[in-house]
Amino acid sequence: MIPLVRRMTAICALGAALAACGTAGPAGSTRPAPVKSPVSASPSATRPPVLTPGPGGLTPVFEHGPRDKGKIVAFTFDADMTADEGPRAASGEHFDNPGLIGALRALKVPATIFMTGRWAEEYPDEARSLGGDPQFEVANHSYSHYAFTPSCYGLPTMDAEHGRADVERAYTAFRKAGLRNALPYLRFPGGCYDQQTLRAFSKLGVTAIQWDVVSGDAFATDADAVTKQVLDGVRPGSVVIMHCTRSAAPTTERVVRTVVPELRKRGYTFVKVSQMIAASQGHR
């Protein structure tokens, strides 16, 4: 499942198969990019905001929103199923989490779901439902959930050039599942990337989405500890990473049901990543 990292320079300690660090990349510009992403799953009446490419056309990276434009926070959930986990799903292991999605709907929390193409193939009805619900937005988490750097804490790897095709394959899987409005946002598997990755993916026109708050829900069994980590970490403009899989993140629904009312009590408003990017560009 997905490795986690607080920041690109943070020290990661979440286990061999579930921890990751991206190397330092360019700070994303706050000016909107004028070019339509070539990997958008389908045309949209309203083009989602993206960041302008970095120096030399490098893929821009977004970590968090503005700290000075009100108490807004974006919850993100990685629906990550690795390409070789089909037999486990066939034997009854659950890589989805309908209870979590139901909780988000009941609590009226907008959220961004970073989905692998393999997950969309396994759960096409859920993928289509998420894509058709305006409360949510779906973005790309690759097809296979293989890392695009040589070492990413135990994930299988592929080079960046093959990784670019893997991301395009995910958009194809989304369309086949009936999900036709996936955004031109990409979360690297494990959060791992380097300069070579950013160069290779620049041709896709995507904005890479990282985070500044690690929930710690991956493989966690103590919902209270995860809740505390989220509440202690959130600041205005935060992007929180969590997971949408019963298999590897069984406490997440309970965490959400506790954290959401507490953050609202503290004055926070929940937004999607696209709204957070828009806020960083001066649009609300």
Predicted regions and their residues:
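Sec-exported extracytoplasmic/periplasmic mature domains
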Residues: 105-109, 131-132, 168, 172-179, ...
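His/Asp/Glu-enriched short active-site or ligand-binding loop at hydrolase and phosphoryl-transfer sites
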Residues: 193, 197-234, 268-279
